[in-house]
């Protein structure tokens, strides 16, 4: 009789729904309707109502939280003459209730609000609640029967999402009653919809705890997807008919049928009646049965029959008498936590007490609120090994060159280039290579500072030594007054030291005020949401200091350019390094031409490191090869004789030089008396003969045998100055010439 009456009421309500194009419906969800979960089923209910009532103005909005909901909804209520607002989530409840209270007695705004909950209904506020503890209990029974390992995992929103663990407990007690040996592990996610946490937590339940059955009360199917990816059967326990999508990969699912409740509620609003409060659960009347169960083909018939029979018992039993309200575990729990029990039966928890279950019951294993562990992304080990091996090989090669410098230090090619400064340059290259090895190594605050120190000091040593030793060549050769110049290595060391001191001071400032340190950075490069990378970072003061260091290096290079330009006229290969320095600068410029645009454009940290290290290797190696290969080549070709006959002669003294000049003068006079043309004595420079503007290589004669050029000019050699340049001390006078009288020069005559 009751069944007949309820059916008639439902038919009367549905038949009295007048299709109306003017009825306006708004539905609020907290997530996309494509979530294959709760929001999708709410949308299915909206579509069912819209079709049944021919509603043309049926809108759906994704919104969450009180403030967002209020800001979205209030203008619509005020301006659009909305008939019904379905606030599907408890997230919407506060805002919907506030707006409903604002217009409860409004003569113009007649909007009805459907909210989740079991509170009091008003003239424009409808309450609906559904009991998913009952369907969780049925799902738990299925999981307990299905598990092979007797290990079940579960994910819940938890108290952080205003959700207690009573429904987790309902699932557990269902599994426990059919399988007393089951172990039950569960996480609280902190939200109904957090795919990242859901995926990670599910993976942990499978990999760490060995669960072979996973269930949840979340809005989407992320947990089920992870289970399927791990070759396990999934359970659809979020209200969406997952088996319709995933087929036999989902062995059990239940679906919410919101149309069965939204339709009569919308019909009541359209007819002007106040629906009041609604309660959804298993129901013996199919028109009001909220849950639709679906089983896989591999589920035994006995299991199906047991669960269907149990769901019918729940449908005909008052909620207070359900098994999850009354059992030996909950009786102990109520005593332990002093929760209210039912007046008629103290071994059963009351409805109010049920919603305060937030601690594990019985042997439930609570794993805590899940937080995703950040994954550290390391620098590519293959790149690290590659740069380290290449740098190590180059260090070995440079050490061999240093040995070669020491071994061939007495050859003109090496001696004329100052062996000690050549080795300084090579040491600078080694320091740079070591800096590159550290640059690609594991990042720490010490590493961040060390790599800048090493690379800058190495560069200062390499370039500074080249510039200083070539500066000496310039001073000696650019000497029109024919003065004997004494410039020893000890006089040049302070200048190299000055280059290093400037570098050290700037780096000390960078270290002290730049706050250069290693930090754990997220959201950079292509890192995932829960990935991080350790990078070096400095503040703006440090960046300014770094620019100053780069400016200092630029100035050092410009000085090198100037010096190389000044010694370009020295036509003895051993002394003239202008081409080598120029080629080195070309290599540096080429790298800068490529690097600067790349560094200005957005780069991933690993790509940036690779570019910088490749550039460092190329610049350093190119500079060393350009400067040193020609020297060793001349050693190989010419040996101890050098490229110029001057190196084959006995070292001369300054007196010998004066004698050569006098002889040159006499030869010039003799040539004039014999009728020859006037012969000019070229006195520019005191090592090489000929005009410095002449790019052709000059021929050197013996000290006491001046020679003539094709144009009749008499060349003057000055082996004494060569001796002074190639020795660390001033050149000695020949013993046989010490007591000789000075030769008169032209001015003395």
Curated annotation (Swiss-Prot):
The chain crosses the membrane at residues 386-406, 420-440, 457-477, 493-513, 545-565, 580-600, 610-630. Residues 1-22 form the signal peptide. Glycans are attached at residues 67, 164, 257, 271, 345. Keywords: G-protein coupled receptor, Glycoprotein, Membrane, Receptor, Signal, Transducer, Transmembrane, Transmembrane helix. GO terms for cellular component: plasma membrane. Residues 698-716 have a biased composition (Polar residues). Residues 23-385, 441-456, 514-544, 601-609 are extracellular. The keyword Signal applies. Residues 658-749 are annotated as: Disordered. GO terms for biological process: G protein-coupled receptor signaling pathway; response to folic acid. Coiled coil: none annotated. It is found in: Membrane. It comes from the Eukaryota. Its main location: membrane. The keyword Transcription regulation does not apply. Residues 407-419, 478-492, 566-579, 631-749 are cytoplasmic. InterPro entries: GPCR_3_C, mGluR/GABA-B-like, PnrA-like. Residues 725-740 have a biased composition (Acidic residues). It is a multi-pass membrane protein. GO terms for molecular function: G protein-coupled receptor activity. Disulfide bonds: none annotated. In the N-terminal section; belongs to the BMP lipoprotein family. In the C-terminal section; belongs to the G-protein coupled receptor 3 family. GABA-B receptor subfamily. This is Metabotropic glutamate receptor-like protein M. The gene is grlM.
